[in-house]
């Protein structure tokens, strides 16, 4: 698995502010075969930054507006390591149909999604908009199970993974 941070020129990435268009461009950059089952997760973390997690290194030059990229193998985190995490997601639950969660349910939702992989120590979020509403979550945690965390990073969290939600980014927390 690879993690790519692609720098975008917002002036040259016209149309890429639409989730569906960005999803198609990312899929083509990773694997041009539309029937492929290659795992691909992505998130637009800022207007000038696109992050992609995929089975193969993306051909970042195929992404409209891409100016440069840093591509690295996906890191593994050992049990007991303190980490910083980041997630863009639209928290929902099935209640007959998929419905958005209220903000006071977010910490329980996150704890449930991270169960077994991470022990949550802090979480905060900012509403990004959309329907259902997307949120940018950040926080700190301790790795409980390295393999379970790797699966979360590979498969994504929550609904909307094809449209730029669900990518969990994890990095070591700097010692204090």
Regions inferred by a protein language model and the residue ranges of each:
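RNA-interacting cores
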Residues: 1-176
């Amino acid at each position: 698995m690879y993690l790519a941070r692609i720098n975008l020129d917002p002036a040259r990435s016209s149309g890429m502010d639409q989730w569906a268009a960005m999803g198609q461009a990312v899929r083509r950059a990773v694997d041009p075969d539309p029937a492929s089952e290659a795992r691909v997760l992505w998130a637009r973390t800022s207007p000038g930054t696109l992050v992609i997690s995929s089975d193969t290194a993306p051909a970042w030059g195929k992404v409209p507006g891409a100016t440069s990229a840093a591509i690295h193998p996906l890191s593994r985190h050992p049990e007991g390591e303190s980490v910083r995490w980041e997630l863009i997601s639209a928290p929902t639950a099935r209640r007959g149909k998929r419905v958005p969660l209220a903000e006071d349910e977010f910490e329980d939702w996150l704890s449930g999604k991270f169960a077994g992989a991470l022990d949550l120590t802090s979480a905060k979020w900012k509403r990004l908009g959309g329907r259902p509403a997307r949120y940018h979550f950040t926080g700190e945690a301790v790795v409980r199970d390295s393999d379970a965390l790797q699966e979360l990073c590979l498969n994504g969290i929550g609904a909307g993974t094809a449209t730029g939600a669900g990518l969990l980014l994890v990095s070591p927390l700097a010692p204090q």
